[in-house]
UniProtKB/Swiss-Prot annotation:
Family label: Belongs to the SIS family. GmhA subfamily.
Catalytic activity of the protein: 2 D-sedoheptulose 7-phosphate = D-glycero-alpha-D-manno-heptose 7-phosphate + D-glycero-beta-D-manno-heptose 7-phosphate
Keyword Metal-binding: yes
Name of the protein this chain belongs to: Phosphoheptose isomerase
Role this protein plays: Catalyzes the isomerization of sedoheptulose 7-phosphate in D-glycero-D-manno-heptose 7-phosphate.
Length: 197
């Protein structure tokens, strides 16, 4: 029987391996995603972010890093988590269905050149799929953070979008990589804005 200590150690080991595997395939796409967001922000655009459950928390975490700061003081950057307005979420969910809680907000707030960050560990979250459709209707770019095989969202993306897919079967490991990717993108943005890299 495995001890609790062994279980915890196994989480560390698996998380490290998952990050090492992700590094092999996601460094360049992460830079592309950061550059896409920078281009949007430099053109007075905004970034909208959405997801469900832990991915909703990641969307909020990302927006907070943008509007506040990541690790260094800098100007505020326009980012909105579509997961925080309970009145909008419940009204849209009640009147149109849960699949549309993000897409209605994307249509209301999104403009051509803006960026949608859609987060779904399965790549199959119906409301994130609808948000991607709405973003494309608005001529927005999409950065999709997904897991496993990328799901339906990966298949929807255009050449001008960026897929950050973590090909791991466990949701916890995918989520851990997603927050690492979010932090890496924030760092890239800050490096360009503050250091001219």
């Amino acid at each position: 029987m495995t001890t609790l200590q062994e279980r915890v150690a196994a989480h560390f080991a698996e998380s490290i391996r998952a990050k090492q595997e992700a590094e092999k395939i996601l460094v360049e796409p992460t830079v592309q995603a950061a550059e896409l967001m920078l281009q949007c922000l430099m053109n007075d655009g905004k970034i909208l972010a959405c997801g469900n459950g832990g991915s909703a928390a990641d969307a909020q975490h990302f927006a907070a890093e943008m509007t506040g700061r990541f690790e260094k003081e800098r100007m505020e950057l326009a980012a909105v988590a579509l997961t925080t307005d309970t009145s909008a979420l419940t009204a849209i969910g009640n009147d149109y269905g849960f699949d549309h809680v993000f897409s209605k907000q994307v249509r209301a707030l999104g403009r051509a050149g803006d960026v949608l960050v859609g987060i779904s560990t399965s790549g199959n979250s119906a409301n994130v799929i609808e948000a991607v459709k709405a973003a494309h209707e608005r001529d927005m770019h999409v950065i999709a953070l997904t897991g496993r095989d990328g799901g339906k969202i990966a298949a929807m993306l255009k050449d001008t979008d960026v897929l950050l897919n973590v090909p791991h079967p466990r949701t916890a490991r995918i989520q851990e990589n997603h927050i690492l990717l979010i932090h890496a993108m924030c760092d890239c943005i800050d490096s360009v804005l503050l250091e001219g890299m």
